[in-house]
Amino acid sequence: MAKVDVLNMSGIKVGSLELADALFAPDQVNEALLWEAVKHYRASLRQGTHKTKSRTEVAGSGKKLWKQKGTGRARIGSVRSPLWRHGYTVHGPQPRSYDYAFPRKKLLGALRSALASKLADGKLTVVDTLELKDAKTKQYREALDKLEVTRTALLVENSKTLTQSLMLGARNLKGVELVLNNEVHPYDLLRYERAIFSKAAIEQIAEMLEKNASKRKLAAAAAAEKEVA
């Protein structure tokens, strides 16, 4: 079992938390799966509103400009020809959705990989609560400084304990995003340098991942722990 320190918002250790090796061990990192998850996420963000005019949409008559033979000029059927200026575009882009189906098991596997990677790099922090007595942006900035957040950070809170004061206090922090435990995505964990979870949020995520993890892998991890013990 991986043991993680639980801090308060002042950066002081107030406890510890054990995380299953089957979910958070460094050997759980699957870079290929992370790449697939990020590719799918970024594809789903594309608007897909690009469009070029087809033959029926460009302006111009459909009348043949001159007879087929006898003029010495190249044959032409319409002023809207794609070979001519102001003509239509052949096989041009049309509005479409770039989203595609991505299996839930693969998404959860990518989430396990992202969490294991953050934990192995020492970039995952667990706090007892993200709430502050005076939930102002300035106080949250000072708290993040005490937690040694120098660049960007992802704050993850339990959906059942999220308060409006936390949302208002964190929304104006530069380089900081607040998400719920049931909407955190592998892309978010890779995008931000630090990941700060409330204890309730990381416990909920660990429980969800354990329910959906392979029973074979869990059994193998448990056997490995017994051998080490």
What does each of the following model-derived ranges do?
Residues 1-47, 93-229:
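Extended polybasic, low-complexity segments that bind anionic RNA or targeting/receptor surfaces
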Residues 52-91:
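Glycine/serine-rich anion-binding loops at beta->alpha junctions
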